[in-house]
Amino acid sequence: MLSALPLLFLLLGGALARPDRITFPRSACEAPPAVLSEVQGTLQRPLGRDSRSSPANCTWVILGSKDQTVTVRFQKLHLACGSEHLILHSPLQPPISLCEAPSGPLQLPGGNVTITYSYAGARAPMGQGFLLTYSQDWLLCLQEEFQCLNHRCIPAAQRCDGIDACGDGSDEAGCSSDPFPNLNPAPAPTLACNLTLEDFYGVFSSPGYSHLASVSHPQSCLWLLDPHDGRRLAVRFTALDLSYGDAVHVYDGAGPPETPRLLRSLTHFSNGKAVTVETLSGQAVVSYHTVAWSSGRGFNATYHVRGYCLPWDRPCGLGSGLGASENLGERCYSEAQRCDGSWDCADGTDEEGCPGCPPGHFPCGAAGTPGATACYLPADRCNYQTFCADGADERRCRHCQPGNFRCRDEKCVYETWVCDGQPDCTDGSDEWDCSYALPRKVITAAVIGSLVCGLLLVIALGCTCKLYAIRTQEYSIFAPLSRMEAEIVQQQAPPSYGQLIAQGAIPPVEDFPTENPNDNSVLGNLRSLLQILRQDMTPGGTSGGRRRQRGRSIRRLVRRLRRWGLLPRTNTPARAPETRSQVTPSVPSEALDDSTGQACEGGAVGGQDGEQAPPLPIKTPIPTPSTLPALATVSEPPGPLPSVPVESSLLSGVVQVLRGRLLPSLWSPGPTWTQTGTHTTVLSPEDEDDVLLLPLAEPEVWVVEAEDEPLLA
């Protein structure tokens, strides 16, 4: 454990030794090209490329304007030329392939710069890698050249030769032969320090800017800008070439003895950039400090009072140089900024009336560029809808269209996206100074979640109620009945239809069997049945001599009674009942004839032909061997039987036949008729009425007769 601590400190020391390096993980080679929008930065070969088997292809894109130059300086570049390559490409130059460090910095003008590092892989040799720094700045001129204010470079011999070689007159400004005699001459660049400039505009530069002169000791210079006007001053540094350790500071106010207020500090990181500083008052102090043996040229700057333009510039607005811009020193524009596709004026004066576009339209790019042929209307600018291919209509927006919000980076987004919890501007300025508010996504998720929870709650309540109802129903089966429920459940059933007819509650229906509610015996049921049969067999009934069609069940019952011999068959002549010799006594036909007319309710009569039905057979016990001799001695028929009512005999016969048919096993043979002397005693019908009316059953197989066939309705 102790031996690992020194190694840990060494690793931390190595990581902190170069904190300015920007390292890229291995994923930078596998993802899409990395876009670098910073003004300056550092690049090195991606770490983690220790594996020599797999190839690599890493790409970085440095965003830049077409009027800027990207300067690349190599601190280290050692690649294996056969297997590793570093390619730099810009729109205005052919690709540059490197495997060794160049002699000096590379200047790549024209806009975006693409840097590509490739490795062949397959265990090919690898170099030590590369380390470079880049910066976006204006094009720097050589030491023997003069840099114009419009960033052009001309030979130093063309300075103050009476010819406008720069195109903006900056090479002739401050000379004895000023091309603008009607204007106050601008002071010529001077090598003196600690000067006070009191004009409304002017040009000043550091000592040795026009010619490089290194000194062996540090230098310090001050310039006091006091045009004696209360309006603000705009100080613009058109060229910067500072060495390491050199610095330029801009203060607000007149300086000592007053405490100055620092507005801006410029170092070698600002080299090649055009920097504009606006004061808070009508005075400013510019200080310049160099180190010994400084290799930097210094700076070149101009100043003017807000509301005025330099003689070689044009005003953005109408009138005496007053423009509509609210930015620093941009109420004027130079000839080089005319029709370049970038709005330097807030109202687009520098891009209005350019060749190739109709009146009221603005070009997407400068002449000679791919976007120069496309033109757009003012309504298409700064509305968060890109019209130009390179997005020139959405850059440097001073004002946005209605319904849009202007970001601090001079871009526009929809106004509804402001303070919604999600940054839409590049710098996130649309979420600054916002009161606490939940994002739309959180609110939407909360609403959807609440709806889902409410739906689940309703389903849960429905299931709970259903289960409770089922459980309550199960418990109610075993629960005792209440008095009210018992009264409802135990109510007496309503009377039947036949009982209502018998009680006289409703009128009787023809051919419907009535019953006495107080007579539920078998005898009463048989009487009702015989009444139906009597009505059916009565000639000339209520139907006017025509027999009514009976129900199927009644017709079947009548056929069975006829088959059993309980009813006479129709259209059959009456015959005397056959008597069993020496066994069954017969009833004389005269007695039956006499009793036919006296038949009361419940008797059976013949059909329409008026024939008399045969008497019912009398059931006698089966003779036994002990009774055979006694019966054999009887040679004469018994005397006449006593007069028995036909109804009683018929009912008795029906009951006996039903009992013999349905209950053969329960019937014990015995004498039905008892002889006392010369006559037979018949059992009382009341003794045979105490039977149950059981459903008709057919334990035996009956022979189907012709009468069993169903009648046609």
Curated annotation (Swiss-Prot):
One Pfam family it belongs to: Ldl_recept_a
Keyword Glycoprotein appears in the UniProt entry: yes
Stretches assigned to the Extracellular side: 18-441
Annotated disulfide bonds: C29-C58, C81-C99, C141-C153, C148-C166, C160-C175, C193-C221, C309-C332, C316-C345, C339-C354, C357-C375, C364-C388, C382-C397, C400-C412, C407-C425, C419-C434
Every CUB domain range: 29-137, 193-306
Predominant location category: membrane
InterPro entries on file: CUB_dom, LDL_receptor-like_sf, LDLR, LDLR_class-A_CS, LDrepeatLR_classA_rpt, Sperma_CUB_dom_sf
Keyword Ligase recorded: no
Segment forming the signal sequence: 1-17
GO molecular function, one term: low-density lipoprotein particle receptor activity
Family: Belongs to the LDLR family.
Protein name per Swiss-Prot or TrEMBL: Low-density lipoprotein receptor-related protein 10
Organism: Mus musculus (Mouse)
